[in-house]
């Protein structure tokens, strides 16, 4: 069973281009308490765009 407040939860990164494309990753809550923003490739628009953490 997973702990209630897991240190490394699984999060979804949703594209800011509005395509609905998502990546799934893990993050360390102690080192990064704020929402994560990564620049990754969105194959729908065929560009690198910002992906923001979705809660």
UniProtKB/Swiss-Prot annotation:
Any one GO MF annotation of this record: structural constituent of ribosome
An example Gene Ontology CC term for this record: cytosolic large ribosomal subunit
Superkingdom, taxonomy of origin: Bacteria
PROSITE patterns xref list: RIBOSOMAL_L33 (PS00582)
SUPFAM superfamilies cross-referenced by the UniProt entry: Zn-binding ribosomal proteins
One example of a Gene Ontology biological process annotation: translation
Alphabetical keyword list: Ribonucleoprotein, Ribosomal protein
Family named by the database record: Belongs to the bacterial ribosomal protein bL33 family.
HAMAP family named among the record's database cross-references: Ribosomal_bL33 (MF_00294)
Name of this protein: Large ribosomal subunit protein bL33
Organism (species): Leifsonia xyli subsp. xyli (strain CTCB07)
């Amino acid at each position: 069973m997973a702990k209630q407040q897991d240190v490394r939860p699984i999060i979804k990164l949703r594209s800011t281009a509005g395509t609905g494309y998502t990546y799934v990753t893990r993050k360390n809550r102690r080192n990064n308490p704020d929402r994560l923003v990564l620049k990754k490739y969105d194959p729908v628009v065929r560009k690198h765009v910002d992906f923001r953490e979705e809660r």
